[in-house]
Amino acid sequence: MEEEVAALVIDNGSGMCKAGFAGDDAPRAVFPSIVGRPRHHGIMIGMGQKDSYVGDEAQSKRGILTLRYPIEHGVVTNWDDMEKIWHHTFYNELRVAPEEHPVLLTEAPINPKSNREKMTQIVFETFNAPAFYVSIQAVLSLYASGRTTGIVLDSGDGVTHVVPIYEGFALPHAISRVDMAGRDLTDYLMKILAERGYTFSTTAEREIVRDIKEKLCYVALDFEQEIQTASQSSSLEKSYELPDGQVITIGNERFRAPEALFQPSVLGLESGGIHVTTFNSIMKCDVDVRKDLYGNIVMSGGTTMYPGISDRMQKEITALAPSSMKVKIIAPPERKYSVWIGGSILASLSTFQQMWISKQEYDESGPSIVHRKCF
């Protein structure tokens, strides 16, 4: 045992899978969490066609495939496809033998118990890993920011969670989940671009809209004011070149799409905005910890990457909080990957090494051991 074996860290998101080695400062592999199967069998004679494609390859061949996302709203719903994604991660992306490395996976807050057991079972029985651990995504984001107490707003492609954490433990009674995230904002942007006369309808065109969203959208500090500015001048307009060379211009759509985070009613959703959800989660916590939560509001996930989101959040929470309360929003520049980074930090700590569930423990106790060792 001269050479320390690096643990594998895999953060399975609804939209993207992030994977790499513990101790690294960024994931080595980032690819779409998609499994594609041919729509028609046997039309591609001589192509040596596979019965399924994963990630970027599925994305690039999407014309002939039916695409499925095995993770919906942050929770695994299709285990066969999930297994394919993990297989692809180990063998094609990281090029490692999973039976030689401890594996750390991430899970959504309030993940069903049966899901954690199934995950544990697949890692040990299908991939024969020597050791395994599962960690809550928001908690890892908090670790990545160098804290153990705070409230994490984690918003990715499929789901948004608000998770208050005290001394490293998530407070389950105060966790909120909102089924509104990046994918919904992309769909909404598609809808409001159609009102301008630009129609995007296929799944391939949806990817273009996602790119427009990532490159041009931002959050307005004062929505009404911004709408006024946009109607009076063209200073907020930007142009975007489509793959076919056509150039389109977008104006108030740039901030109208992300505004849905603060006003979900525009999507026809009942829930309050992310600021209200955060405030409500804080109010569900013990009065003694609230000050620590207000002072450590940590943003994480790709949907928190919009320019202007921290300032807007600061303004909205300050308006809701008691007047003397110090409100601080932490938005690390690498927050798109902070769940993965937190996992990398955790799995490389010397104090963490006795926390792993070993293959031996699994063989003795079965999948339910995960509830005793990972919390």
UniProtKB/Swiss-Prot annotation:
Matching PANTHER family: ACTIN
Disulfide bridge partners, by residue number: none
InterPro entries: Actin, Actin/actin-like_CS, Actin_CS, ATPase_NBD
Full protein name: Actin, gamma
A GO molecular function held by the record: hydrolase activity
Keyword check for Nucleotide-binding: yes
Keyword set, alphabetical order: ATP-binding, Cytoplasm, Cytoskeleton, Hydrolase, Nucleotide-binding
Source species, domain of life: Eukaryota
One Gene Ontology term, aspect cellular component: actin cytoskeleton
Top EC group: hydrolase
Lineage: Eukaryota, Fungi, Dikarya, Ascomycota, Pezizomycotina
